[in-house]
Curated annotation (Swiss-Prot):
Belongs to the class-II aminoacyl-tRNA synthetase family. HAMAP family: Gly_tRNA_synth_B. It is found in: Cytoplasm. This is Glycine--tRNA ligase. One of its GO terms (biological process) is glycyl-tRNA aminoacylation. The keyword Protein biosynthesis applies. The gene is glyQS. The lineage of its organism: Bacteria, Bacillati, Mycoplasmatota, Mycoplasmoidales, Mycoplasmoidaceae. ATP binds at residues 190-192, 200-205, 275-276, 319-322.
C-alpha cells in the first residue's frame, strides 16, 4: 500500500523547498491561506497546462472561456446559492469552538435533527451548545462609490455559473451542435466555517470546471464517458497512484440541490479519504433557473427533431490546489539508499517544475558546465544550474524537488566531451555525448 505521511510532513517539506508558504507569515500568518513559491507556482501552472492539453486543446467540441469573479446578485438567486449554499453550524459555549454539525455527527443532516442527538464537543467534551443555525458561504461586497448607487454583489463560489449565463452567447458565436462543452479556469471563494487540512479546503482557491451541454437522452452515456476521461487523466497524465484513489457514487439523499447524479473520485489525503474530483449530472436545472429569472430563452433548437429544449449539463469539476496536494502526496516518498535517507518527489517529467539540472562536479568546472546548461536552456525543457554543496548533496536536493535528470560535467568531460546523466527514480547513470543531449532528452524525457 502506498505510504501517506501525516500532514505536517508535507507542509514542512513544501515550505523548505520553496513550493508553498504560509500567507502573511511575517504577520503571524492568515489562517489557512497559502502562497505558492517559485517551485509551487510552476508546478501549479504545469498542472493547469496538462488539464488544458488533455481536455481542451485541439478539441473541436470544447470551448474555453473566462468570466469575472464578481457577478450580479441575480445570478446567485437564480442558481440557488443564496438559498441553498449553506452550512449548518453550532458553537460550543464552553470552549468557543465552532463546528459544522455534520462534522460532529454525519447522521445529522439538518437543524431539525440536532435535538435528537446527545453529542459531546470534540474539543472539550462538554454538551454546552448554542442554537443551531444556517450560515451562507458566499462572500458578499458592494460596487459603486455613492451610497444610493451601491449594489450588492458576490464573489463567485464556482466558475460554472459564468459559463451557464454565456450559453446562448457562445452558441450563437460558435454555432455548435450538441454535445459541446464550455471549460473555464478561475478563482473561486467560499467563506468556509472550518477551513483547514492544508491546501484541501481554503477560502480562496482555483477551479477547473467543464460544462457539457447535451440532449437529455445522451446524459447518462456522456456522464460515463467523462468518468473515464477523468480517471485516465489522473492515472496516465498525473500518474496518481491508483491505490490512493476510489470512486464514490452518492445516494439521492446526499445530492446537491441541482444534481441528478454525482460521482466523486476520492483520494487518500493525510486526513482521510476525501473528494478530489467531482462529476455531476446537473440536468436542466441551471439553464431552467436562468431562463426563469432572466426572462431570456436558454433553449437549444434541434433541427433534426425540429424542436426546442433545455440541454442537460454534465460537469467534471476539480480544485487545482487539491490536485496539487494529491500529486505531492502520491509522488513523495522517503527511502534509505546506502544507509542514508533521501526524499524523492517522483513527479511525471512533463510536470516537474525543473526537469533537468546541470551540475559541475567541482567549481573548477563551472564555466564548462555552464556552457552545457546554456545549450539545454535553448530547448523546450525547464533547466537549472547549481554549484553549491558537494555533488552528493546536490543530487539529494534535486531528488527532493522532483528534478528528473541530473547532468554532471566532470574531469573526464574535458577529454571525451560527454557528461553523466543520472535518473532520479532508478539512480541509473549513463554517459552521453554533449552534442547528443537534446536528442537524448527528446527520446527519453518521460
Amino acid at each position: 500500500m502506498a505510504k501517506v505521511y501525516n500532514q505536517e510532513v508535507y507542509v514542512q517539506f513544501l515550505k523548505q523547498h520553496g513550493f508553498v508558504f504560509q500567507s502573511s507569515e511575517i504577520y503571524n500568518g492568515l489562517n489557512n491561506s497559502w502562497d505558492f513559491g517559485p517551485l509551487g507556482a510552476v508546478l501549479k501552472q504545469q498542472i493547469k497546462q496538462a488539464l488544458y492539453n488533455f481536455f481542451i486543446k485541439n478539441k473541436a467540441d470544447v470551448l474555453l472561456v473566462e468570466t469575472p469573479i464578481i457577478l450580479s446578485e441575480l445570478v446567485w438567486k437564480a442558481s440557488g446559492h443564496l438559498a441553498n449554499f449553506v452550512d449548518t453550524l453550532v458553537d460550543c459555549k464552553s470552549c468557543k469552538y465552532r463546528f459544522r454539525v455534520d462534522q460532529i455527527n454525519a447522521e445529522i443532516k439538518a437543524k431539525k435533527d440536532w435535538n435528537s442527538f446527545k453529542v459531546n464537543c470534540p474539543n472539550c467534551h462538554n454538551q454546552n451548545w448554542s442554537e443551531v443555525r444556517d450560515f451562507n458561504l458566499l462572500f458578499q461586497t458592494e460596487i459603486g462609490v455613492v451610497n444610493n448607487d451601491k449594489r450588492l454583489v458576490f464573489l463567485r463560489p464556482e466558475t460554472a455559473q459564468g459559463s451557464f449565463i454565456n450559453f446562448k452567447n457562445i452558441l450563437q458565436a460558435k454555432k455548435r451542435n450538441l454535445p459541446f462543452a464550455i471549460a473555464q479556469f478561475g478563482k473561486s471563494f467560499r467563506n468556509e466555517i472550518t477551513p483547514g487540512n492544508f491546501l484541501f479546503r481554503t477560502r480562496e482557491f482555483e477551479q477547473f470546471e467543464i460544462e457539457w451541454f447535451c440532449k437529455p437522452d445522451d446524459a447518462n452515456s456522456l456522464f460515463e464517458k467523462q468518468l473515464i476521461m477523468v480517471e485516465q487523466f489522473l492515472q496516465t497524465v498525473l500518474k496518481i497512484n491508483p491505490e490512493l484513489l476510489k470512486k464514490h457514487e452518492y445516494d439521492q439523499s446526499e445530492l446537491a440541490h441541482y444534481a441528478k447524479k454525482t460521482t466523486d473520485f476520492l483520494f487518500n489525503f493525510p486526513h482521510g479519504l476525501k473528494e478530489l474530483w467531482g462529476l455531476a449530472n446537473r440536468g436542466d436545472f441551471d439553464l431552467k433557473q436562468h431562463q426563469e429569472f432572466s426572462k431570456k430563452s436558454m433553449s437549444f433548437f434541434d433541427s433534426e427533431l425540429n424542436q426546442h429544449f433545455l440541454p442537460f449539463i454534465i460537469e467534471p469539476a476539480v480544485g487545482i490546489e487539491r490536485l496539487f496536494y494529491a500529486l505531492i502526496v502520491s509522488s513523495y516518498r522517503r527511502e534509505i539508499i546506502n544507509e542514508e535517507e533521501r526524499e524523492v518527489l517522483s513527479l511525471p517529467f512533463d510536470l516537474c517544475p525543473e526537469q533537468i539540472i546541470v551540475l559541475p562536479l567541482v567549481n573548477k568546472l563551472k564555466k564548462e558546465a555552464f556552457s552545457v546548461f546554456e545549450t539545454l536552456a535553448k530547448t523546450r525543457w525547464r533547466v537549472c544550474f547549481e554549484t553549491t554543496g558537494s555533488i552528493g548533496k546536490r543530487y539529494r536536493k534535486a531528488d527532493a524537488i522532483g528534478i528528473k535528470y541530473a547532468v554532471t560535467f566532470d574531469f573526464e568531460s574535458l577529454e571525451d566531451n560527454a557528461v553523466t546523466i543520472r535518473d532520479r527514480d532508478t539512480l541509473v547513470q549513463q554517459r552521453i555525448a554533449i552534442k547528443e543531449l537534446p536528442q537524448w532528452f527528446m527520446k527519453n524525457g518521460q
